Each structure stands twice: as C-alpha cells, then as structure tokens.
Regions:
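Cysteine-centered nucleophilic/redox motifs
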Residues: 8, 89-91, 124
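Carboxylate/His-rich catalytic cores and anion/metal-binding grooves
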Residues: 18-52, 184-190, 194-214
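Exposed beta-sheet edge/beta-hairpin loop segments within beta-rich domains
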Residues: 79-85
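Secretory-pathway-linked proteins and extracytosolic
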Residues: 98-214
Length: 214
C-alpha cells in the first residue's frame, strides 16, 4: 500500500489570500481504492483562539474535470472549507490519502514546489523498503536531499527554505518544465513505466461501446 501524508501551515496576510486563494483546500481521491483520513483541520486566529473545522465544512463533490467523463464519475473531491479566517490567522491541515495494495503498480511522484505565495519552509520525504530501487531528482533546483536508512526503510528528504513564488501566468507551470519540482519513482526503468501507461490505452471494444451509451 501507499500513503501520501500532507501537513500544511499557511498564514494569511492579504484579503486576496483569505478570500480567493486559500479559503478552501481540495483533495481528489478514488474511494474505490483509496481512503481519505483527516488527522487535523483548524484555524489559529491572530489572538491564539483555535477554530476547529466543523463537520459541515467538509464537502464531498465530483471533481470538475470529471463532470463530463462517465468513466471517472467514481472519483471524489473533498473540499475543506477553512473557517474562522482573518488577516494574521494560520490555517492548519493534516491529512492522508491511503491507497490499497494493487491499485498503483509502483510509487510515482511528481510534486511542484513553487506556489503563488512564498513558502518559508518546504519539506518532502519519500520512504520505501530498503531493497526497493528509488530514482529521484529535484528539477530546476540545486538542493541535495538527505538519505537515511533505518529499520529496513530508506527515506529521502528534501528541505527547502524561503521558496520564492512563481509568476501567475500560464507560461510558468509544471508541464512547461520551468518551475521547481521533485520527482521520485520505484519503476525499474522508463520502459517499465511506459508499459503501464500503454496498458491504460488498451481497452475492450465492447467496454468502450457500453461506456459511450451512458
């Protein structure tokens, strides 16, 4: 199985950040093969008051990208509506997406680092069994990860400080290849990864016909 755990702290300094950019968090997952666990979600206001995210602020919807794609209508997007927001408040969110064995053939990570706002501290760790090959790289950056092995587990950790924001324009993006990103994979080779991608495009004609009728 695989677990992706995300922990974030985000302090609001502008009305744009509070009302447009960071008032909600979005988590996409496939409930047929994945489980979402919210460990913590709250807002620490400027005076130190804690406002826990109420149950009705966790809203499950269909991802907008899947709206006109019946084959993907089983996907879910958890919208976490952060409450108690004000200038100077800090949002705390800690969650895991746990994938059952057999759904993902290998670990395959591609995480963009830069956001529209500056990041004081960014940490990403990847842990795999010690005997599992792991290929990794920081794209468009020079930071060197720390590699540790303990208890039969190998962990690779990147820690970046004071990451500058990316420009808000379409020409600057992960697909364009001009932002910092961390990639990591346990595929033995690129050829093995391509085989998995190729299988996704192979389908039974009958299945396609039935899907088209929906």
């Amino acid at each position: 199985s695989q677990e992706m755990r995300v922990q974030k702290e985000l302090t609001l300094f502008t009305h744009t950040a509070m009302n447009r950019l960071y008032g909600e968090s979005f988590i996409v997952y496939n409930p047929e093969f994945q489980e979402l666990k919210i460990h913590e979600s709250y807002t620490r206001q400027k005076d130190g008051n804690i406002v826990k995210t109420p149950e009705n602020a966790f809203v499950e919807v269909l991802p907008s990208a899947a709206a006109d794609a019946p084959a993907y209508n089983g996907l879910k997007e958890m919208v976490v509506v952060h409450t108690g927001l004000e200038l100077g408040a800090t949002i705390y969110l800690d969650y895991s997406v746990i994938t059952r064995p057999g759904y993902l053939p290998e670990l395959d990570v591609c995480e963009q680092i830069e956001e529209l706002s500056p990041i004081r501290e960014y940490v990403l760790s990847v842990s795999v069994p010690e005997n599992k090959p792991l290929h990794y790289e920081l794209l468009n950056g020079k930071a060197v990860p720390v590699v540790k092995t303990a208890g039969g587990v190998k962990t690779v950790t990147w820690a970046l400080k004071n990451v500058q924001p990316r420009p808000s324009m379409l020409a600057v993006s992960l697909p364009a290849g001009n932002v910092q990103a961390i990639v990591a994979s346990t595929y033995a080779s690129k050829a093995d990864a391509l085989k998995v991608i190729k299988r996704q495009f192979e389908s039974n004609d009958k299945e396609v016909s039935e899907l088209a009728k929906r």
